[in-house]
Design a protein with these regions (language model features):
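Terminal helix/beta-alpha structural elements that buttress the NAD(P)+-binding lobe
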Residues: 1-201
Length: 201
């Protein structure tokens, strides 16, 4: 202590430390750090920064940094999603899920998405091909032989998701513990992940 929370930020570079390259005072940037972002000034590694597009407000840029990077790493670094593959995204109406749906759609994957029925129009507008109301529908009866499942819900949803992944496919959970033995029995790869703040993703 004192400990300052917060990971997402956006602002103008005030000063550049010795040996730091790629940015200069006055640059408009945003990014994600390991903590300390809820402050007037943030110390960040240049590897955690990207230049803010002019069309983004600082508020929008800061709001997107952590959740978009989390979705990206889940889909591509851990999930290795490719064009034409089938992906099921649990919790698609949330912040990370909404980015995941859009990224997957951009990749030209077939996107299955679960959320509450009230969010149907929103999730479909993001690019989901198939919407599943988790309250009234059994996702396991709709989404079968998935190349990838992104779990943002955990609990029973995670436990039942192993059965909808095709042999050789992948399950990525951000909120639960991947069961390696169960994954082996199903012939799939399962991984638990947390976001790694960096500018590469």
């Amino acid at each position: 202590f004192p400990w300052i929370p917060g990971m997402d930020f956006a602002g103008t570079v005030e000063a550049v430390g010795d040996g730091a390259e790629g940015f200069e005072a006055g640059d408009m940037v945003f990014g994600c750090t390991d903590g300390g972002a809820y402050a007037e000034y943030v110390e960040a590694d240049p590897a955690q920064l990207v230049v803010k597009p002019m069309e983004f407000s600082y508020v929008d840029a800061a709001a997107a940094a952590y959740v978009s990077q989390t979705a990206w790493q889940a889909l591509y670094r851990h999930g290795r999603l490719g064009k034409g593959q089938h992906v099921l995204i649990h919790g698609a109406a949330g912040a990370v899920g909404a980015f995941a749906v859009q990224f997957a759609r951009y990749t030209e994957a077939e996107v299955y998405a679960t959320a509450a029925g009230r969010d149907r129009d929103f999730v479909l507008s993001l690019g989901a091909d198939v919407f599943i109301d988790y309250r009234t529908e059994d996702f396991a009866a709709v989404a079968r032989d998935m190349d990838l499942v992104i779990d943002l819900v955990g609990g029973d949803t995670l436990a039942r998701s192993y059965g909808v992944v095709r042999p050789g496919g992948r399950l990525v959970t951000l909120v639960g513990k991947a069961e390696e033995e169960l994954a082996r029995e199903c012939g799939i790869e399962a991984v638990s992940m947390g976001v790694e703040p960096n500018a590469r993703d």
